[in-house]
Every structure is written in structure tokens, then in C-alpha cells.
């Protein structure tokens, strides 16, 4: 036949299709192979069993004549109606446009397109005839894959069988002399033939469990040998089945070594999850990596694909154990906990992209909940056909090219009824205040919450996020920077809320044993007070107040309706240079979650909360301020008096109700601000005037003053003895803290210089290290919740009545009902300091003493003496009598020095001062102190350069030259 006459169409449905063009021998669509190329052994390998069953029926003995005719004329493969199967059906002779370039509009109609296509295929057929190529390359695949007994050339090759082999079917044996036409599959790996693993969904491969497959030892070893990149390796079908098999074994067979009963850990967790009606199964990464270390590493480095398999397995396991649970939840989510590697937000780099990370911080902003497309269907606006479903994820965007029915290119509208959505929310996670390096701004990272993780955290809460660090395209960044920049986000897989907010500071068993041992010391309260800022001399009242504030009282919630705060607020008011700011800095370094700010540097919204418009969603969002960030911690405000009145009023609610109500831009909500407030302020004019009341010395209103539990007044009084001790303390501190390399021969030992507090501890071994003090406070707040007895309330009521009576006569700070609660909070804090479960009489007396010291210090100088005399029985409780006797002795020394100055003139010729012991005894008896021998042998007496002369009955004190 001439080439010009060879116009037979390639499709059997075309007119003029001739059966004579069907080849006698065909194999696969990739080329023609003579059946003789297959060896007998190869044929026996593949279909030997089938031939054994069929051969006796091929040529039956009774029909020998018919068989002879068929042997002579050949078998008629086509009956009279075979052409009906290939009749022309134009409505089905259409092809999808997926993957085609649709940028060029084709103006031809369907008939013209099909005519041109037939002409092109006829030309290809003519070329095949000229070149001697296989004339059967365009035959339908259904004709190639027929397993007939008469014509072995239509048998499906083994490599095509491998793709569709059921997982439970054993591997077909293969002889050593297989031909080229039957390439076997390598152990444990499927060959990519007609369909790849990504083209055929795993759930459709078999009616049984799609992840059930048999892997021998060699197969498992091959699975662990990663070929190519890890992300491509874990997407292979055989690797996914291997991961699924191992994870299913882990879920059903893992036994926690700590479980004495030996029950299956995750079967129990699945039952608890179902009982709680949840859809998230938490997998401990440390347990998983102990059983399957390689797969656990794959999970950390390529989490997207591995978690997808794990969630499918978890869903099957849960639904197998609980048949009806699929009616409640359609999907089970796998949450990875205890990821061992913890990264700071500022240390995340591009190497972490598309890996699983664990970060922590404070939630500063939270968006609303949005519906995100998960499984979308479209309606063709021209023919009404429903297209889809299309699966949408965070990495790809679904675009429909054309309608397969009418070939229209749109427009397409989302079918709202059949489209499936999922919840979507965005958080802004900022570094915790305590870990930000000095002089640096805190970094932040966007966190995406999906499905049941919605609303798991609110602004101000400290959380840990385990998720996938990924990137997304942000057009605004490209416009801003002028070159392609991708925004990075963390897709949360697991969110752990730090309920106690102290979990960042881990306590070992040795630490707990040492803390319990310290708590048995009857002087532990005094030791803790001494350990507060030991580099600052004196100020025992401030140190006591700060210690009580750091331990805190017990929060109360009356029947879930009325909440009483347990945090203690402290105000430090005093002259400049009295170490107020240094106290705040010490608390910032010692407290677990302390936020430091200044009155001038913080506005009202900077302290409470601000409302911002989200640049992406264009909706208003809340961003917490300093008080919100310090939730369950301490907020330190320096220069409190420099704040504007409007800014100061904004923290009234935060200090008492410990919440911040917001009604801005249509947002009406409340944020948590459960923190202690320790503020420092300077008096009016720079110096505190004792002839004026407290309110006259500071620009603060009564509502804000009454919210402070303790008011500490610090006055810079000229006292030769106190000044001398202070100067000596400062000089010794500097001498012991010389920089490295200076005066090497005079330097102190290394163990002293490495720790700034070592010098102070050398002078006083009772001082605890800052690290141990942190651990002690953490342990106390986690494990001790003291309760108060009814008997103690009577004494508190009596003291309150007396204070109310005295405050009505004076002009100091008025006593209100809040001060009763202050006494209770401080007594609970003192009990917690001693790790006691109940408040004792000792704790109540200490709280009353601190409150009285605070109240009396705010009065005028003339009123203070009368109040000290009236409340002496409360104020002398648990006071260090050595300190009191030292104060009395110094007063006597000053009186003698003043007398000598009047009588003899200038005192430069005096070398020492002598005080009679009898005078000191008389002074001590006024305070009900009768035994002076412990004082004479104490360090207070000796360190202040006092010498006792028992023979003469005098106390000698040398004067500085």
C-alpha cells in the first residue's frame, strides 16, 4: 500500500478501521517484541500455573475436528458485532486539559479539531511503516494486557504485575535466566510502571489494610538505606508502607517500662482519647526514637510526609479499636511531644526549613478563627458540572484550567455545600522576657494553628510549640525588599501550655532533696531574706517585702465566681541613691518570668494591651503589654512616679482584679495579668520629708497607693556609724571583685572572684546562692499551697480594728479592707517560704509586723513614735534582737559623742568612745530584752568594732582616724 493511501486512523472507533492491521504478536505499548524472545523458562515462571489449569481444556478430545479447523484457519477473535464497541462517540472522544498550555486560544470547533487529530495520527502511522517501527504502538492498552492461553504475547509483563500486586501476595519466584522483557522489581521497592505510587492512592490499592505488607530482613535493611534526598525517599510508596507498618506495631505493642502493670501504652492512650471525645493522639518522641530511631530521625527531618502516613495509620488503628468512633471524628491527628531539641526563636535559620522544631515564648497576638479550604469542589457556571474534589494544602494552590464537560475555561464558583473547610488561626509568639540578651529586641515568629489546636492559647500565656518550620510567599515582603523574600511560619503540631510557668527551670532529685533539707532549718526565713540582693547593704524591710512578693500568697476563687488575688504588690519610695533600681534588677535576674519597664518608657497600652490591625487579614487584633507578658510572674516598674496619670489609671484593674478589660475597635474582651507589681518611685522634690505624710511626699493617688500591700520608705539619713559600715562594705565588695589581670598578687582565690556573691557569702555563710534561691522559689510555688486556720483570723481582725482607729487620728495612708487581705497574703507567703502546708501563728505575726512597719513608716515623724509604742508587742516579733541592740548601742554612742562635743569642743583628739553596760541594759529592758550575753558574743557586736570590758563594765568603740 502506498504511503499516501495509508490513512487508516489509529483509533478503532474511526471509520475504515481494519482488523488486518492487528498484529499477530504484541507485547507492551513501549514496543513490539517477538514472542520467541521469551524463553520457555520465563513463560513458565509467570504463567506456568495458569497453563497447567487451562491446557487440558484447550483441545478437548471430543471436539477434535473443530479443533483441527481452528488450528488450520486460526481463531476468529472478532465476532460480527465487534465494531459496535468501537463506534464513534464524540461526546466521549474528549481529553482533559490538565497539564496542557491553555494560554493560546483555539478558535476551532470540535469537529475540526478531531479531523486534524486523525490526519496527524495517519501521518504518524505512515512514518512507522516507512521506518519499520511497530505498527501496534497505538493499540488500546486493554488489548496488550490480556492474559490469554492461546496467545502468550498478550500476557501482562511481570513489571506491570509488580505495581498492582496485593501487599499480602508473596513474591513470585524468578529464575536466573530471565529475559529482558521481564525486569523484576528490586527487593522491597516497587517499580514505577504504568502508575507511580503518587498516582494511585494508598487507600485504593487493596480492599484490605493498605499498609499491611510483608518485609523480610533484607527488605528492612534496604528501607533504611536512603537513596537520593530524604524528602523524596519518604514519599515512595514502599517506604510509606514500611513506615506505616512500623508505626502500627509501635502503637499496638509498645509497653512503657515505667508501667508496672505492663499494659500497652498507646492502646491505653487511645482509649483515654476516645473517652474524652478528642481527635489528637499524643506520641512521645523519646519513646518512639527508642524503638525506631531511623524513622524518628526521618520524622524530624521530613515531617510533612511522615506525619501524613502516621495519621492515616492512627486513624485506622483507632477506628479498628472503636468501630463507631468514625461517626464522631473523621480524622485522627498525631501530635509529637517531648521533642528533645529546643531552639530559641532568634537561633532559627534556613537549615531548619521543612524540619520539625520546638520553640517557646509568650503569645502576644492572636487572630480570629478563619475557615480554610481543605477539600474544595467547583461549579462550572456554563454547564453546571460539579468539578472536584480538589485537595488544598498550605503548599499548593488549586486552579481549575477548564471544564471536562463543556471545555469552558470558567468562571468557576466554589460549591459551598460540598466543600470541606478546616479551622485556621494565627498566633504571634515572642521570646520570653527572661531570655532576651541585654540590648536586644525580642524576636517573634508567626505560628499557624489548625483543626483542634484552635484557641489553645491566649495573649500573655507562655507556651511551647512543636511544629514544622516552613515558608510561604509574601508579596508585601517582595515589594518592600525589592527581591524575592519568603516569609517563614511555624505550622504547629503540638502546643504545650506552661500551666505552672516554671517548667523551664527543671529540678532534679538532688535539688529537691537539698531544698527539703534547707526547709528544715528553723532560720531558713532569715537566710532567704539575707540572700535577697546580698551585695546591697542593709534595707532589711525591703528585702523582707521582696522575698514575700517573690514567693506570693495563695490565689482563691470563690465557687468560680469571685477571684481573690494571691500576688503581693510592693512600692519602694525613697531618696535617690538608695539602691531602689538595683533591687528591681536583682528581682529581674532571680524571678522566672519578670518583665522590667520604666514609667517614662511605658505608655498605657505598653503596660496593658494595644489593638493593631493585622496586615494580612486587615482585622483588629490584640497585642499584650508588659502586665500581660508578666502573667504568672513579676512586673517591675521603675520611675513609677514619672508616669502620666492616664497611664497610671490604666493599671488599676490589673493590680487588683489581675485582668485587663479591652473595649476598642469592636473588640470587647479580657486579658489575664496575674502578676505581682514591684514599683520604685522618687518623692516630690527628690528628698523624702519626714514632716509630711506619705501622700504629700509622692504624686500618687489613694486608689493606687491602697493597691500596694507593702510600702517601703527609704531615707538617706546621715549617720556616721552607718555610713562607715556602708563605705567599708562597698570598698570590700570592690576589692574582692577586681577585673582579671589587675594586681594578681592581691587577688582573692578563683572561687570567690567567679561568683559576685561569693565575697558576701564568705562574710555570711547563711546566704544562699542565687541559683539555689531560684530553685527554692520554683519548688515552693509548684508544690506548696498553704491554708489559713480560723483561729488566726481573730488576731488579724483585732489588729485591723486597732489600725483603723489609729489611722483615723493620723494623716498617713488610710487603712482599708484590702489591708486585711494583705496580711493574709503575706502570712501565706511566709508559710510557703518555710514549705508549710498550713499557716501558723508565727506566719501571721510576721505578716502583721511587716504591715505595721509599712504603715508606721508612712506617718509623720512625730506620729511614728506614738505608733511604735502602741504596737510594740507586734513589731518586736521575730526581730533580730542583735540588730535592735546594735541600734540601741549606736544611739548611746551618738549621745556620748554629742555630749563630749558640747563639753570638750572638737572631737578630733578622741580615739575611742566608752558606753556603760548598765545604760545598754536599761535601754534593752524597755523592749523586754534582759539577756545581753548572746549579743556580746555575736558577729554584730564584733564586726562593728565594739569591745566589751567586763571588769570596768563598759563597752569601748574606736573612732575612725
Curated annotation (Swiss-Prot):
Residues 524-730 form the MCM domain. Residues 39-78, 205-220 have a biased composition (Acidic residues). A motif (Arginine finger) lies at residues 706-709. It catalyses: ATP + H2O = ADP + phosphate + H(+). One of its GO terms (cellular component) is MCM complex. PROSITE patterns: MCM_1, MCM_2. It is found in: Nucleus. Its main location: nucleus. The keyword Translocase does not apply. Probable component of the MCM2-7 complex (MCM complex) that may function as a DNA helicase and which is essential to undergo a single round of replication initiation and elongation per cell cycle in eukaryotic cells. Component of the minichromosome maintenance (MCM) complex, a heterotetramer composed of MCM2, MCM3, MCM4, MCM5, MCM6 and MCM7. Belongs to the MCM family. This is DNA replication licensing factor MCM2.
Amino acid at each position: 500500500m502506498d504511503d499516501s493511501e495509508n490513512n487508516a486512523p489509529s483509533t478503532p472507533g474511526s471509520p475504515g478501521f481494519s482488523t488486518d492491521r492487528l498484529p499477530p504478536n504484541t507485547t507492551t505499548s513501549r514496543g513490539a517484541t517477538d514472542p520467541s524472545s521469551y524463553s520457555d523458562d520465563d513463560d513458565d515462571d509467570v504463567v506456568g500455573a495458569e497453563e497447567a489449569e487451562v491446557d487440558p481444556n484447550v483441545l478437548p478430545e471430543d471436539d477434535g475436528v473443530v479443533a483441527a479447523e481452528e488450528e488450520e484457519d486460526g481463531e476468529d477473535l472478532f465476532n460480527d458485532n465487534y465494531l459496535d464497541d468501537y463506534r464513534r462517540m464524540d461526546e466521549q472522544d474528549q481529553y482533559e486539559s490538565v497539564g496542557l498550555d491553555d494560554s493560546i486560544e483555539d478558535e476551532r470547533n470540535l469537529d475540526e479539531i478531531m479531523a486534524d487529530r486523525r490526519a496527524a495520527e495517519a501521518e504518524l502511522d505512515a512514518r512507522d511503516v516507512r521506518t519499520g517501527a511497530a505498527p501496534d504502538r497505538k493499540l488500546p492498552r486493554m488489548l496488550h494486557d490480556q492474559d490469554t492461553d492461546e496467545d502468550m504475547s498478550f500476557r501482562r509483563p511481570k513489571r506491570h504485575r509488580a505495581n498492582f500486586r496485593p501487599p499480602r501476595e508473596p513474591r513470585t519466584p524468578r529464575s536466573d535466566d530471565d529475559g529482558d522483557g521481564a525486569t523484576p522489581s528490586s527487593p522491597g521497592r516497587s517499580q514505577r510502571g504504568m502508575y507511580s505510587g503518587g498516582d494511585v492512592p494508598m487507600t485504593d490499592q487493596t480492599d484490605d489494610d493498605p499498609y499491611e505488607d510483608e518485609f523480610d530482613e533484607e527488605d528492612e535493611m534496604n528501607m533504611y538505606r536512603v537513596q537520593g534526598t530524604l524528602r523524596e525517599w519518604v514519599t515512595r510508596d514502599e517506604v510509606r508502607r514500611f513506615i506505616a507498618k512500623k508505626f502500627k506495631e509501635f502503637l499496638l505493642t509498645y509497653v512503657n517500662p515505667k508501667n508496672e502493670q505492663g499494659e500497652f501504652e498507646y492502646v491505653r492512650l487511645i482509649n483515654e482519647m476516645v473517652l474524652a471525645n478528642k481527635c489528637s493522639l499524643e506520641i512521645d518522641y523519646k519513646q518512639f526514637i527508642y524503638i525506631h530511631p531511623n524513622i524518628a530521625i526521618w520524622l524530624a527531618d521530613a515531617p510533612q510526609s511522615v506525619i501524613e502516613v502516621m495519621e492515616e495509620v492512627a486513624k485506622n488503628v483507632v477506628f479498628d479499636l472503636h468501630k463507631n468512633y468514625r461517626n464522631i471524628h473523621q480524622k485522627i491527628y498525631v501530635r509529637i511531644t517531648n521533642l528533645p531539641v529546643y531552639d530559641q526563636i532568634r537561633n532559627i535559620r534556613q537549615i531548619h526549613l521543612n524540619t520539625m522544631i520546638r520553640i517557646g515564648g509568650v503569645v502576644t497576638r492572636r487572630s480570629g478563627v478563619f475557615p480554610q479550604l481543605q477539600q474544595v469542589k467547583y461549579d462550572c457556571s456554563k454547564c453546571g458540572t460539579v468539578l472536584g474534589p480538589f485537595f488544598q494544602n498550605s503548599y499548593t494552590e488549586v486552579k481549575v484550567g477548564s471544564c471536562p464537560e463543556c471545555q469552558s475555561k470558567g468562571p468557576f464558583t466554589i460549591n459551598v455545600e460540598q466543600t470541606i473547610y478546616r479551622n485556621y488561626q494565627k498566633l504571634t509568639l515572642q521570646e520570653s522576657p527572661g531570655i532576651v540578651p541585654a540590648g536586644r529586641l525580642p524576636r517573634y515568629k508567626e505560628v499557624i494553628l489548625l483543626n483542634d489546636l484552635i484557641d489553645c492559647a491566649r495573649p500573655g500565656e507562655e507556651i511551647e510549640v512543636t511544629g514544622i518550620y516552613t515558608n510561604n510567599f509574601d508579596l508585601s515582603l517582595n515589594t518592600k525588599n525589592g527581591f524575592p523574600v519568603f516569609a517563614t511560619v511555624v505550622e504547629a503540631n503540638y502546643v504545650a501550655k506552661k500551666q505552672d510557668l516554671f517548667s523551664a527551670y527543671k529540678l532534679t532529685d538532688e535539688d529537691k532533696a537539698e531544698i527539703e533539707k534547707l526547709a528544715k532549718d528553723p532560720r531558713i526565713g532569715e537566710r532567704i531574706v539575707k540572700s535577697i540582693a546580698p551585695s546591697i547593704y542593709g534595707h532589711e524591710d525591703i528585702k523582707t517585702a521582696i522575698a514575700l512578693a517573690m514567693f506570693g500568697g495563695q490565689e482563691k476563687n470563690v465557687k468560680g465566681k469571685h477571684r481573690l488575688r494571691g500576688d503581693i504588690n510592693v512600692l519602694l519610695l525613697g531618696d535617690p541613691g538608695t539602691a531602689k533600681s538595683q533591687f528591681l534588677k536583682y528581682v529581674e535576674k532571680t524571678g522566672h518570668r519578670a518583665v522590667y519597664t520604666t514609667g517614662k518608657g511605658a505608655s498605657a497600652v505598653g503596660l496593658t494591651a494595644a489593638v493593631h490591625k493585622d496586615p494580612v487579614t486587615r482585622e483588629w487584633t490584640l497585642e499584650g503589654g508588659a502586665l500581660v507578658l508578666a502573667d504568672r510572674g513579676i512586673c517591675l516598674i521603675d520611675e513609677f512616679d514619672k508616669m502620666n496619670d492616664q497611664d497610671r489609671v490604666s493599671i488599676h484593674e490589673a493590680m487588683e482584679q489581675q485582668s485587663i478589660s479591652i473595649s476598642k475597635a469592636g473588640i470587647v474582651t479580657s486579658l489575664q495579668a496575674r502578676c505581682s507589681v514591684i514599683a520604685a518611685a522618687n518623692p516630690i522634690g527628690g528628698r523624702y520629708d519626714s514632716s509630711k505624710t506619705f501622700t504629700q511626699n509622692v504624686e500618687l493617688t489613694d486608689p493606687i497607693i491602697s493597691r500596694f500591700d507593702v510600702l517601703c520608705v527609704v531615707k538617706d539619713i546621715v549617720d556616721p556609724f552607718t555610713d562607715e559600715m556602708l563605705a567599708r562594705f562597698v570598698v570590700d565588695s570592690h576589692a574582692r571583685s577586681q577585673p582579671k589581670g589587675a594586681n594578681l598578687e592581691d587577688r582573692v582565690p578563683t572561687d570567690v572572684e567567679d561568683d559576685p556573691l561569693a565575697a558576701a557569702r564568705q562574710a555570711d555563710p547563711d546566704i544562699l546562692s542565687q541559683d539555689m534561691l531560684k530553685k527554692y522559689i520554683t519548688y515552693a510555688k509548684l508544690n506548696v499551697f498553704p491554708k489559713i486556720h480560723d483561729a488566726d483570723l481573730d488576731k488579724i481582725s483585732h489588729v485591723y480594728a486597732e489600725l483603723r482607729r489609729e489611722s483615723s487620728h493620723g494623716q498617713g495612708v488610710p487603712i482599708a479592707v484590702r489591708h486585711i487581705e494583705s496580711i493574709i497574703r503575706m502570712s501565706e507567703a511566709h508559710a510557703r517560704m518555710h514549705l508549710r502546708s498550713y499557716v501558723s501563728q508565727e506566719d501571721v505575726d510576721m505578716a502583721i509586723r511587716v504591715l505595721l512597719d509599712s504603715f508606721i513608716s508612712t506617718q509623720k515623724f512625730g506620729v511614728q513614735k506614738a505608733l511604735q509604742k502602741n504596737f510594740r508587742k507586734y513589731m518586736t516579733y521575730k526581730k533580730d534582737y542583735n540588730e535592735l541592740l546594735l541600734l540601741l548601742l549606736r544611739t548611746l554612742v551618738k549621745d556620748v559623742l554629742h555630749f563630749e562635743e558640747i563639753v570638750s569642743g572638737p572631737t578630733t583628739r578622741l580615739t575611742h568612745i566608752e558606753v556603760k553596760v548598765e545604760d545598754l541594759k536599761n535601754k534593752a529592758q524597755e523592749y523586754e530584752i534582759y539577756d545581753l550575753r548572746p549579743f556580746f558574743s555575736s558577729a554584730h557586736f564584733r564586726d562593728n568594732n565594739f569591745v566589751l570590758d567586763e571588769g570596768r563594765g563598759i563597752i569601748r568603740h574606736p573612732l575612725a582616724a
